[in-house]
């Protein structure tokens, strides 16, 4: 008896579990039917609005009746005995709780509306075929029935079909890979991508692709492997002359980096160029964004490292695609076009300093002008890029026309080496000329920061001392006159630098290194000079070398004035470099032979 009771309980539990599963399936069936009814009702309402302008035939609407469901309601109704058992064991779980949203329409009302939908002549539409089988109801495509309606129709790209010529294979695959990458939503699986690629094949290439990608083959749904097989099948050979022209015309444009790199490497295998030349050609074909970012990157060893560096840049600058959500049609962005512009005419934006008036920069920016600038900016960028591409193409065409008919790569490499050597020699000559010009300019205009050391004999020193004592007073007046003229030329009459003459220190033990710096002992209590902020840079042009050996006597001699013609016919006053101190061979040592000491 105990075994029979146990078997009965197990059977009863199994029956209850099966009944729960049956109820759940019936509920899912009804929910799917209601979702389909809502979608069809929305489509019919939209078409009804358009029917007043365009005479379209009325659509066929399915009637959601009881005979269209997989499980009939009268067949699954429980008997009174089963109802008693369910009340004792588990509650009956069939219908979900009713929704309380104010905008929600009840399911019964929706079914009645769809059933009452008739044609204008009064005849009701015939019902559709029964609903699909149970496995199809649980497919993921039916769980999201509104996802397909949101995808816009895909336009076929304007790409020339491929007939099997390996010369055009690289550019053909680059364009198609970019198009598929830009429209990933339309190609969710590999089979769709393979079929889309085969649709652009013609002739023998189409026959080969169809035979290779039949159902059951490994290439039917493997898009990357199918691309590799295409490159192996139509690998050439390509003449080096043709490959050279093709790789020079290859430009990335709006294509992805991966497709451009694959196309470039496919053509590079037919050339005998060295790695440096391949890198230069690869950079010429890159888009402007990558070339700008590569300026901040480190040096690369070969072409593979250059491609990897570009891949890193692509990950940084790539704009993530926004996933299309079901039921969301209008996404707001800061600069989206607003259809009703009259409402936004009064909306204004002010700058941060609007209270200071228009003279201080408080200008008003309107939304309408902002939207126009935002729409015009990409167009200007595209036009500039197109102009740059046209100029590059013209330059390359001129280079191709000027080239010799002999396309042997050894001779080309030799010519390139000779040209590079000539360019390097010219650059070196230009640099030498620039250095000479800079030295001459420095000698003319920038020798105020230099200290000239002259080697004098003991007899000449005494004569020099006498001459210097006589001309001290005259040179002081000339020095003051030069400063007034310079201030008058620059319009800085009120900004003259007031400096007191430094007191010389008789310290024979002071070295050059300690005397060059701006130390307090060089002034001996003299107050620092008072100067304007705009004249602060002038203080670095006056080296304090009063404490050097041999400078205790009045050896300082301002140079004579030099007159230079200005840009506008004005006469400018400029002083030659001044001799601040002189050294004898005994005092100068090894520095006296060089002739100059830079400060």
Swiss-Prot record:
Residues 78-90, 393-432, 439-450 have a biased composition (Acidic residues). This is Retrotransposon Gag-like protein 5. RTL5 is one of at least 11 genes called Mar or Mart related to long terminal repeat retrotransposons. They do not correspond to functional retrotransposons, but rather to neofunctionalized retrotransposons genes. Residues 77-97, 116-139, 377-450 are annotated as: Disordered. It comes from the Eukaryota. InterPro entries: DUF4939 (IPR032549), RTL1-rel (IPR032567). Transmembrane segments: none annotated.
